[in-house]
């Protein structure tokens, strides 16, 4: 008999003792069952209470979110149905599974989601996090007033201080307005004076709208288009919108056009205002909004026929301003010293913003600040140094929004230091900045029409710029601005406002674009500030010599083609003409290299090694062919980062040049311009390239005088070869790409050319009847006489 069977028999045996033991066990079993039942009831009650609390939480969350959404002009959320199915599942599950499921649910309160109208997907949690921050921006209090003005007026001016949220929010409200209209949906364009702002703001707005950058929200800058057929909101540089107008004169694809940062008065913005003023007369459905960060908006209102003004105050804190008692001899040295002192001595937390004039200065300052802070030892707080200028790639530009390093255990404060060009004055807002260092300088374009010289010069900023810079310190809490100039200089030497770019620029590109737009009467074009007649005449003269305009001032077929290239007229002419010299492939590469930042890196601590590396690429005939050698070597070395580092070459510049070259190639293909090369073994390989350079730059030539200095042809300016040239001799005739005004007059990026090429390629310009007397004229006279007597059968 089995043990189990015997046990069963034993339990049935009629023994009092045994029976009593069995009854006790039964009672224990019953009690256990009862306890478990009570536990289940208690668990169920607790679960019900938790679920009720969960419902209440969800209800409160939905109510607060709906209030937020309604204030944002979005539809409120509906009650989630998923909760009911979850509760049914709870009751069907065992105690353990119900408890674990509920615990997971309670740990993360799910927010009922509404559908993103652009993607037809539920909004992500990040969308709601960003929306809460958006609703705190000062501009949100004015949404109803803005919408009312937008509906009732065709154009108006909006003044909003930097940080008010106008650049990110206003275009989104315009998208809402356009979507509410019946009929075909037109897009919204928002122009920016700087490419960095166009890219970074587009990324931010794409995040706010919960869409992918390049889809519903995109950007367009020179040589880079991040948009698609789905794009309804496009941020772009002002020059790119002007370029779009060439092929779409009434800008039909847009229902609202916003000119942001109009106070900067860039060349393209001023031209756009004139163009748009005419377009709104022909398109009653187009809305134009002019946005400015400064309060002198009256001029814009008058220009746009006394249109309305909407003013949105920023949320600023007081800023304490400090001046230097004496002028600083070396503002870069003073700026670096000030950064170190603030980092070491200031007991308040807060980041620093240092304004400098350009990439070289910024890179140098970043290196020196890092080195000096590292030398101070581990007791000093950590520092994160971030450069900011227009040619940085987008991912590096975004670093300005990173948090500062944390405090050390000894209490030393970690800080972020942003070293920027004047882009950080108004175009971008960097939260966390408490200390601003302002040396008082910026690079500005300056043009002298008499000698046809345009240069970027380091000049003193205006009072308006100084005020904008100081205001960056009071964004989040009271701040301090250290002006590295005297109070007297601020009050008596600085101009009130920055001089409009149109009054200090070469207008060759502008006139070519206006002609392409069909605007022939330049004298009566409605400029907000008309340029000097001499500047306009010089531009017309340049385009006539380049054969872009005929003698009547009308656009030629060549000129129309030149206008399609996003290049200066001389470069555009050179690219097109290179086809006739069988060297368009090489000229494309040179043009691309001239269109990007300097490719040669020359660190302070390794100047000799950098110079030696540069000479490995040097071409005997000059700098243009040296750039070609660099590009060819870069491609032959498979675009290697390490190769660039080893050869002191800026990898970013070469990659940008490669991108520019591809885009220019596509434009050439569109016009069926052949891309070809002379056989490399031919003696004409480099000669043809140099001749093609002359087709564009015959007006930028210098002749070596007997005295040993160069004289620019026709304008008779005494100049020297720039120290950066690879030319190891002084050619008698040189073509130059750039006239640089510093302590001396330099010509930069030079190539050795033959004088006979000048008179053959540009006979109209080298007409000796109106040539000033000089050695160059005498030599050219002899060459022309020889050519006319057919002593030179070919050149």
From Swiss-Prot:
Q: According to its UniProt record, which reaction does this protein catalyse?
A: ATP + H2O = ADP + phosphate + H(+)
Basic and acidic residues composition bias: which ranges? 20-62
Record text on activity regulation: ATPase activity is enhanced upon binding to G-patch domain-containing proteins. G-patch domain-containing proteins act like a brace that tethers mobile sections of DHX15 together, stabilizing a functional conformation with high RNA affinity, thereby promoting the ATPase activity.
Name any GO cellular component annotation: U2-type post-mRNA release spliceosomal complex
Q: Determine the domain of life of the protein's source.
A: Eukaryota
The UniProt record lists the EC number as: 3.6.4.13
Record-level GO BP terms: antiviral innate immune response; defense response to bacterium; defense response to virus; mRNA processing; positive regulation of canonical NF-kappaB signal transduction; RNA splicing
- Sites of Phosphoserine modification: 15
- Which segments constitute the Helicase ATP-binding domain? 147-313
Ranges annotated as biased composition (Low complexity): 79-108
The GO terms describing molecular function are: ATP binding; ATP hydrolysis activity; double-stranded RNA binding; RNA helicase activity
Q: Where is this cross-link: Glycyl lysine isopeptide (Lys-Gly) (interchain with G-Cter in SUMO2)?
A: 786
Instruction: Please state where this protein is localized.
Output: Nucleus; Nucleus, Nucleolus
Residues bearing N6-acetyllysine? 488
Specify the Helicase C-terminal domain's residue ranges.
Answer: 338-518
Residues at which ATP binds: 160-167
Q: Which UniProt keywords apply?
A: Acetylation, ATP-binding, Helicase, Hydrolase, Immunity, Innate immunity, Isopeptide bond, mRNA processing, mRNA splicing, Nucleotide-binding, Nucleus, Phosphoprotein, RNA-binding, Ubl conjugation
Pfam families, A to Z: DEAD (PF00270), HA2_C (PF21010), HA2_N (PF04408), Helicase_C (PF00271), OB_NTP_bind (PF07717)
Q: Where is this motif: DEAH box?
A: 260-263
Q: Which coarse location class applies to the principal site listed for this UniProt protein? A: nucleus
Q: How does it assemble?
A: Component of the U11/U12 snRNPs that are part of the U12-type spliceosome. Identified in the Intron Large spliceosome complex (IL, also named intron lariat spliceosome), a post-mRNA release spliceosomal complex containing the excised intron, U2, U5 and U6 snRNPs, and splicing factors; the association may be transient. The IL complex exists in two distinct conformations, one with the DHX15 (ILS2) and one without (ILS1). Interacts with TFIP11 (via G-patch domain); indicative for a recruitment to the IL complex. Interacts with SSB/La.
Q: Which family does it belong to?
A: Belongs to the DEAD box helicase family. DEAH subfamily. DDX15/PRP43 sub-subfamily.
* Its biological purpose: RNA helicase involved in mRNA processing and antiviral innate immunity. Pre-mRNA processing factor involved in disassembly of spliceosomes after the release of mature mRNA. In cooperation with TFIP11 seem to be involved in the transition of the U2, U5 and U6 snRNP-containing IL complex to the snRNP-free IS complex leading to efficient debranching and turnover of excised introns. Plays a key role in antiviral innate immunity by promoting both MAVS-dependent signaling and NLRP6 inflammasome.
Q: What is this protein called?
A: ATP-dependent RNA helicase DHX15
Q: Which organism is it from?
A: Pongo abelii
Q: What is the lineage of its organism?
A: Eukaryota, Metazoa, Chordata, Craniata, Vertebrata
Gene coding for it: DHX15
């Amino acid at each position: 008999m089995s043990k189990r069977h015997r046990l069963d028999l034993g339990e049935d045996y009629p023994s009092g003792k045994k029976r009593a033991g069995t009854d006790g066990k039964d009672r224990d079993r019953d009690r256990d069952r009862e306890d478990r039942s009570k536990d289940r009831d208690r668990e169920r009650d607790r679960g019900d209470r938790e679920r009720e609390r969960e419902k209440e939480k969800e209800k409160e969350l939905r109510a607060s979110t709906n209030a937020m959404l309604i204030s944002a002009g979005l539809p409120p959320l509906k009650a989630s149905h998923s909760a009911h199915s979850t509760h049914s599942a709870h009751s069907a599950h065992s105690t353990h599974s119900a408890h674990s499921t509920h615990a997971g649910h309670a740990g993360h309160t799910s927010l009922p989601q509404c559908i993103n109208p652009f993607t037809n997907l539920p909004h992500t949690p990040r969308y709601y996090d960003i929306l809460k921050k958006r609703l705190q921006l000062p501009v949100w209090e004015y949404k109803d007033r803005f919408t009312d003005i937008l509906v009732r007026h065709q154009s108006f001016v909006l003044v909003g201080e930097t940080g008010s949220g106008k650049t990110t929010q206003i275009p989104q409200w315009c998208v809402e307005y356009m979507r509410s209209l019946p009929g075909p949906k037109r897009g919204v364009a928002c122009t920016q004076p700087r490419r960095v702002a166009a890219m970074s703001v587009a990324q931010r707005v794409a995040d706010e709208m919960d869409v992918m950058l390049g889809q519903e929200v995109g950007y367009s800058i020179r040589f880079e288009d991040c948009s698609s057929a789905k794009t309804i909101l496009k941020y772009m540089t002002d020059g790119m919108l002007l370029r779009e107008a060439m092929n779409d004169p009434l800008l039909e694809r847009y229902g609202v056009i916003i000119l942001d940062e109009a106070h900067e008065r860039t060349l393209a913005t001023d031209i756009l205002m004139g163009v748009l003023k005419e377009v709104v007369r022909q398109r009653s459905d187009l809305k134009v909004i002019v946005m400015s960060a400064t309060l002198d908006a009256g001029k814009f209102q008058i220009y746009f026929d006394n249109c309305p003004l909407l003013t949105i105050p920023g949320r600023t804190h007081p800023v304490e301003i400090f001046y230097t008692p004496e002028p600083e001899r070396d503002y870069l040295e003073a700026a670096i010293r000030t950064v170190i002192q603030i980092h070491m001595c200031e007991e308040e937390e807060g980041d620093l913003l240092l304004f400098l004039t350009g990439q070289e200065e910024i890179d140098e300052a970043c290196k020196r600040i890092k080195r000096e802070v590292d030398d101070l030892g581990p007791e000093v707080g950590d520092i994160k140094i971030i450069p900011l200028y227009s040619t940085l790639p987008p991912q590096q530009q975004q670093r300005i929004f990173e948090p500062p390093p944390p405090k050390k255990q000894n209490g030393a404060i970690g800080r972020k230091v942003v070293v920027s060009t004047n882009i950080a004055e108004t175009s971008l807002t960097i939260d966390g900045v408490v200390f601003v260092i302002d040396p008082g300088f910026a690079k500005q374009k300056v043009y002298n029409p008499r000698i046809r010289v345009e240069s970027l010069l380091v000049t003193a900023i205006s009072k308006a710029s100084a005020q904008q810079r100081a205001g960056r310190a009071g964004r989040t809490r009271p701040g301090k601005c250290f002006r590295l100039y005297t109070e007297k200089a601020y009050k008596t030497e600085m101009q009130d406002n920055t001089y409009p770019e149109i009054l200090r620029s070469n207008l060759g590109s502008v006139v070519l674009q206006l002609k392409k737009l069909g605007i022939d009467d330049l004298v009566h074009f409605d400029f907000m500030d008309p340029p000097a007649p001499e500047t306009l005449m010089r531009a017309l003269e340049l385009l006539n010599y380049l054969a872009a305009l005929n003698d009547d001032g009308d656009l030629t077929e060549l000129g129309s083609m030149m206008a399609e290239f996003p290049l200066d007229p001389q470069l555009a002419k050179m690219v097109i003409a290179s086809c006739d010299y069988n060297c368009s492939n090489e000229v494309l590469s040179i043009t691309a290299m001239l269109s990007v930042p300097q490719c040669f890196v020359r660190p302070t601590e390794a100047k000799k090694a950098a110079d030696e590396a540069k000479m490995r690429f040097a071409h005997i005939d000059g700098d243009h062919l040296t750039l070609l050698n660099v590009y060819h070597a870069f491609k032959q070395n498979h675009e290697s980062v390490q190769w660039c580092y080893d050869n002191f070459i800026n990898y970013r510049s070469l990659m940008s040049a490669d991108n520019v070259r591809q885009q220019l190639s596509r434009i050439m293909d569109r016009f069926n311009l052949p891309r070809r090369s002379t056989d490399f073994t031919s003696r004409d390989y480099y000669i043809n390239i140099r001749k093609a350079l002359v087709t564009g730059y015959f007006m930028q030539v210098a002749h070596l005088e007997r005295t040993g200095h160069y004289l620019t042809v026709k304008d008779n300016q005494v100049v020297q070869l720039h120290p950066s040239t690879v030319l190891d001799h002084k050619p008698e005739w040189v073509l130059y790409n750039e006239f640089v005004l510093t302590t001396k007059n330099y010509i930069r990026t030079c190539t050795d050319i033959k004088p006979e090429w000048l008179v053959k390629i540009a006979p109209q310009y080298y007409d000796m009847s109106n040539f000033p007397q000089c050695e160059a004229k005498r030599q050219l006279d002899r060459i022309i006489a020889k050519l006319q007597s057919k002593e030179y059968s070919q050149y």
